[in-house]
Amino acid sequence: MEFKISKQLIQELEQLIQNKNDQQLEVLLNDMHHADIAEILDELDFNEATYIFKVLDSEKTAEILLELEDDLRENILSRLSPKEIAEELDELETNDAADIIAELSQDLKAEVISELLDVEHAKDIV
């Protein structure tokens, strides 16, 4: 069954974001496939997309990162700290993490690598 984004779903998400109802946001999005959430984030403005991204756990958002349009991914990454980006990369396969880290500036790349928990993973990424 193909996922369809409804206007009602977008409005509900926008209302939950406005009310900072993180728990209900998680409940609503938790069972959705990461590709479907990426589609939803693409329909929201950058602030709303970033808000949802920060509410969800890294296990889910790492996979979402891979599905996002380049400009949205770049915008969300620009709003995350090096530590938050490292948490995302720690959840990804080496080749996927390498693709994402390649999009970062040299300075940010160095900071993110220093934050990675798995030293072997960090070596393989760069």
Where are these regions (language model features)?
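Hydrophobic packing positions in regular secondary-structure scaffolds
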Residues: 1-126
